[in-house]
Curated annotation (Swiss-Prot):
GO molecular function, one term: metal ion binding
Name of the protein: Fluoride-specific ion channel FluC
Activity regulation note: Na(+) is not transported, but it plays an essential structural role and its presence is essential for fluoride channel function.
Catalytic activity of the protein: fluoride(in) = fluoride(out)
Membrane spanning stretches: 5-25, 35-55, 67-87, 96-116
Coiled-coil regions, chain positions: none
Function: Fluoride-specific ion channel. Important for reducing fluoride concentration in the cell, thus reducing its toxicity.
Amino-acid positions noted as binding Na(+) in the UniProt annotation, renumbered to this chain: G75, T78
Membrane topology: Multi-pass membrane protein
GO CC list: plasma membrane
Gene (name only): fluC
Compartments, as annotated in UniProt: Cell inner membrane
Pfam families assigned: CRCB
Biological processes, Gene Ontology terms: cellular detoxification of fluoride
Length: 128
């Protein structure tokens, strides 16, 4: 159990730091649409699509790697709670267009990139 806890702990810390860096690097470009949160969620959507295929098709991988990547790193990187407060802040300020745009970009972008990640990994690991 301890190796699983360490895998999640380290992965989550690294994912959260990357999310913070994305915010520092991108949020100032369009203050009404925090691009750091969007980038974190889109990158996480793509990466989890790849990870889902890899960890399903590669049964020999230690379970701690799945915990490190999906539960830890991608759990720390992606952020539904920050996304939610950004949407609600716009809505409560009467900025319904921005609230809708943020919501739609996160949801459609994440689903699209998750599918793209699954397609990418399936192409990489397809039997010859």
């Amino acid at each position: 159990m301890f190796p699983s806890i360490v895998a999640i702990f380290v992965g989550a810390g690294l994912g959260a730091v990357l999310r913070w860096f994305l915010g520092l690097a991108l949020n100032a470009f369009v203050p009404a649409m925090p691009l750091g949160t969007l980038a974190a969620n889109l990158l996480g959507g793509y990466a989890i699509g790849i990870a889902a295929v890899v960890f399903t098709s590669r049964v020999g991988l230690p379970p701690e790697w799945r915990l490190f990547v999906i539960t830890g790193f991608l759990g720390g990187l992606t952020t539904f709670s920050t996304y939610s407060v950004e949407v609600m802040t716009h809505a409560l300020q009467g900025e319904f267009g921005w609230a809708f745009a943020v919501a739609v970009l996160h949801l459609t972008g994440s689903f699209t990139l998750t599918a793209l990640g699954m397609w990418t990994a399936s192409a990489w690991f397809a039997p010859a």
